[in-house]
Amino acid sequence: MPCQSGIALLIRRIRRPVWAATVSAFGIGMLTYLFALTNTLFLTGDALNNVYFDGNLLWIGRWSSQWLSSLSTSYTMPYVNGLLMIVAVAALSGMLVSVFEIRSTVLAVVSSAVLMCFPTVSATLGFLHNADAYMLAAMLATLGLLLLEKIRWGLLPAVVLIAVATGTYQACATFVLGMMFVRGMQLMICRPDVGAKALLLRAGRYALCLVLAVSLYYVVLLAMTGGGQDAVGDYQSVTKAASLETLAALPRNLAGCYQDFWQAVGPLSTEEGCQMGSWPNHVFIALELLMACVSFWALQGRKPLRFLAMLALCALAPFFLCAIRIFAPDKVYSLMTYSVAGTYLIGIVLMDSLPETLEKLKDRSAGRAAGRALAAASWAMLACLVVCVYSWSIYANVKFHKAKLDYENMYAQCATFLALAEANEEYVQGMPVLVIGDSSYASGRGQPAMHETKMYYTFMKYCLNVDMPFGTANEIRDQARMIEDTEDFVLMSCYPNEGCVQAIGDAMVIKLSEQIY
């Protein structure tokens, strides 16, 4: 079969909503992140340390990161890493539409927009060196869930895929947990043909899959590190996640899940000039709860125990949708909370079942009024989703534009300092140029853009193509710290005064106004 015929056959076989979600997600991603894909950006405080990155993060428990990062180059090239990230999210969107059996093409497109523009994706793009690996991992985890749902013997491949995904980024396990919760709520509310026993069996299957996947993750981690206590660092408590200490802290961490959830559904944008409050999120959640209750009444009838179980799950939703606190209790940020997108997906699957709900309400007393209210609520929920997607997109691009300004500022600083070094009569071609101190230039993205000697060094080496003798930024940092303790450095003037540039040892040193070590 020719390639064009095979592709055409594949397109015909894929359900229209799945295809629509995948294609629209890719298009939305290209439009939303076009500026980031076509500009040189350093979005995170540590990005300058990772201009060259081989994906090896075994030291923080991410044993599969190097494999998934190998699809792109070892340099932070946004038009490669970012494009792979967008492809992964597009595939992920189509898979979730299949898992949730969304029938409406419109809602499939809306779900893909939510998944592509959610703040976790733009935050992931900020880590250019492994943005592709992070989202490829989320895609593999979603593929595991798809196999678990669609194939009778899908448990084993699902366990392996989720374990591999968790080995790239631990938050993938909680992302799958969040999507499982969305599917469970959908079946409990919208599917009267799925009885209580079937729901319990499915919940048990979900729990078994996650327990086995996380266990396999730790088994492989121990095997690859030799089981040594010092082989894995305690970054984000990865070594404590399976400990008795973490289990004992469950009540405190459970409360933390609720705090993290409400923070994640807080203001849509806090950037100056494009602030957007939290009202779209709160209105959407309120209408979502209303639609869940009315849909249950219409589709399930009088099932008080099942209704109470649904209310209990609604109360536990912040845990299931933001459970990363259980695995990383020290700190939670948007990079870890992709599972919170399930908040919006629950509303979308309820809207997808709205035709059946309205049909059932016709035969109920006061059903017509309730039906009109639900129809109006669906329009309001769609409007909230549009506002959310738009605000997330604008917020991301404002950050990208500020990052571009940061880059230009870095370039200007380094070019100035390099010119000072080369103008010094003691400068010899190939001498490392050490900028020691603090330029007092602070980015609004968490850390100063140029806050340590290794940042200047790395920028000069990789961005200005200066021939530097060291391969890593940490090596030059260690040498800078030794030079800082010398008498020659202490007696130097500070920039921009005369005498702020001097050869010390085999390095050309520029002393700034402040020292941060």
Sequence positions of predicted segments:
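Membrane-interface micro-motifs in multi-pass membrane enzymes
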Residues: 58, 62, 85-87, 106-149, ...
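Membrane-interface alpha helices of multi-pass inner-membrane proteins
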Residues: 154-171, 175-176, 181
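Hydrophobic, aromatic-rich transmembrane alpha-helices
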Residues: 263-266, 270-308
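Intrinsically disordered, polar/acidic, low-complexity terminal segments
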Residues: 2-59, 63, 69-89, 99-112, ...
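Transmembrane alpha-helical segments of multipass membrane enzymes and assembly factors
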Residues: 94-109, 149-152, 298-302
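Membrane-interface transmembrane helices that cradle and orient dolichyl/undecaprenyl
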Residues: 141-155, 187-194
